[in-house]
Amino acid sequence: PSRGLGDVYKRQNKYHLQDFSVDDNGMYSFVTRLQNESGGEVSTDLKPGVANSGDRRFYFQAIMDYNRTFGKHDVNAMFIYNQDELVTQLFSGDLIAALPKRKQGVAARLSYAYDGKYLAEVNMGYNGSENFAKGHRWGFFPSIAVGYNISEEAFFEPLKNVFSNMKIRASWGLVGNDNIGGARFVYMPTINLTGTGYTTGLDGDITYKGPVYSRYGNPEVTWEVGKKVNVGLDLQLFNSLNLTMDYFHETRTDIFQERGTIPQYLGTAGTKVFGNLAAMKNQGFDFAADFNKKIGKDWFISFKGTFTYAHNEITKYDESPKYAFQSKVGQSANIPSIMISDGLFKDPDDVKNSNQQIGGNLSAGDIKYVNISKLYGYDDDIVDISDWVWAKNPTVPEIVYGFGPSIRWKNLDFSFFFQGVAKVSLVMSDFHPFGDNSLRNVLTWIADDRWSPDNQNINATYPRLTRDTSVNNTQRSDYWLRNAAFIKLKNAEIGYTYKNMRFYVSGMNLATFSPFKHWDPEQGGGNGLKYPTQRVFNFGFQMTINNNR
């Protein structure tokens, strides 16, 4: 049998909210704010009709599928056509943003299975995006997946007492990405009609503004392409333990990037030039375990665990680093750049003998930095902000894991789940937590462990305090780099069932164990002023009502 399905969808949203403001005399004044669908404020202009925001979306999708089983053969096919148009109504003078955003594409899938043993599926997508010029607008993205249920073979029957199920999987495919960082129509140049001024006249006293390029067009820009390969194994042991293992590898090419190798003497100056210039790879493995077992009459035990390792690496990047060791090639996408500290300046003579030129007047108790360029063999005696290296671990974890049991004994049940990450770092971007880089709002334990005339420890946890922000001491460096690995008791619950009622106590975010103590490391770097993670406790009961007589 076959069937068809058509869809036409239109949506228009505008948000008008009443809010109030308070002046210096404590008087409240109500104002009207207009917001777009995502909640972002568009305007605070009080003139009705001047500020306006909304969107209109037209989405059309048609689906046709086919399913048939004959003998030991199962065949499924599907064809999809879709097109999408989004019009954002903004009266802010941004003509490009007001133009409709359009996409169009077709997709197809064909799957086949024989006797539940041999599985195959082929997919394809042919998609068009307005972001690219004619000739580069459409991308073709096929994929194929195969599977083999070994445990369904007759020769596997003697092993089923141990290996209840075994399946091998593999897939290969291409995926496309037309997201070019929010920019539109990059194949065409953009011109600023009131650009950089130039002077003329005999005395150079006449200044004019004129049109300048703010972005050069690149008609060759096209889709970013990711090639994905996956190999997996599904295994069940003793009808109780389910294991899933996957290895994945992805290479991404033609990544959209601004050029970094055009010298300024060519006249581009601050004008942007974009292209499909970068590439990277990502690989790792996933592991999941699920165990369920009833023991005797009264016991039931369940355990779940997951583990994922993923590492990405930039393999191509258009750049012109000052030093070769600062190239992004070979680094992870989320690795922070940091200066390397060498403790604190000991005394005025230590400062005087230093060639450190970071900014501001240096003093004893300020952070002392390593001359990285000289360590790499460059003839440079000056320590400045260009003396940086890449950190060891990224700010996005490479290892993510979780585990926890669920145990039931008679009418009593208990469960908990731990979640953790590893190989991750964070950078405290401000001088100290919950503060503003100066003497104000300094926590006691920071003040007690800082460098001071009474505590001239060059390895103090915090440098000297300053009345104003210290440019030298607030550089992104390993002085503020922290290990952000953690393991959390994400949730726990204990319950008791009596007849048709279950009473329980549960909690979420109950405990965090981490070498980083200042705030929840899951929030990442900064100064800790993000909304804190809530610890939640629940007490309740559940009642089952059976209407059967």
Where are these regions (language model features)?
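Extracytoplasmic gating/loop element in the C-terminal half of outer-membrane beta-barrel translocons
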Residues: 27-30, 421-507
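Single conserved hydrophobic/aromatic residue that forms the stacking wall/gate
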Residues: 1-9
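Conserved small-residue
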Residues: 184, 292-395, 435, 455
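Outer-membrane beta-barrel signature, preferentially recognizing the C-terminal barrel domain
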Residues: 99, 195-242, 271-296, 332-340, ...
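Outer-membrane beta-barrel transmembrane domain signature of Gram-negative proteins
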Residues: 20-121, 129-133
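C-terminal beta-signal and terminal closure region of outer-membrane beta-barrel proteins
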Residues: 274-282, 327-350, 455-457, 461, ...
